[in-house]
């Protein structure tokens, strides 16, 4: 497994994973392009297996906190610990001495468990946060 910074050439594959992982609420190509290439306060990490991009996480860096804004693993590679590996890489290398926030769908139990096991705590519920009306759990990891 290799984890590296995302590049423009990764855009199509990230979009493909996004649509497979979140079929009812996938980000658009424009949104992913903006996060990957246009914003200086953003960073995208990708994970590869045998030179195939199989997951990514997108981070927003603020002056006092970091926000994990999107993360997905190709569905056929889920339940192999790759999301955990990617999350811990991000935590170990990019988020020293700062609080990290994220939103996760209330019904996304695998992701919720991943974040709880990494030390995140549930802060509050944001009602009907997602486009399809599902609530978001706001989580925080205080470093």
Predicted regions and their residues:
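Residue-level recognition of the GNAT/N-acetyltransferase active site
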Residues: 74, 78, 105-107
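Conserved acetyl-CoA-binding loop-helix of GNAT-fold acetyltransferases
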Residues: 79-92, 112-117
């Amino acid at each position: 497994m290799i984890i590296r910074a995302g590049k423009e050439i990764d855009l199509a594959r990230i979009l493909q994973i996004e649509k497979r992982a979140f079929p009812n609420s996938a980000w658009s190509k424009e949104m992913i392009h903006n996060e990957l290439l246009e914003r200086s306060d953003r960073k995208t990490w990708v994970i590869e297996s045998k030179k195939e991009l199989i997951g990514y996480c997108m981070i927003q860096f603020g002056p006092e906190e970091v926000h994990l804004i999107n993360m997905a693993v190709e569905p056929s590679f889920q339940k192999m610990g790759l999301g955990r590996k990617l999350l811990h890489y991000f935590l170990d290398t990019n988020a020293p001495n700062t609080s990290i926030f994220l939103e996760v769908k209330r019904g996304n139990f695998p992701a919720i468990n991943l974040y709880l096991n990494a030390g995140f705590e549930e802060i509050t519920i944001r009602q009907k946060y997602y486009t399809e009306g599902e609530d978001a759990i706001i989580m925080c990891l205080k470093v």
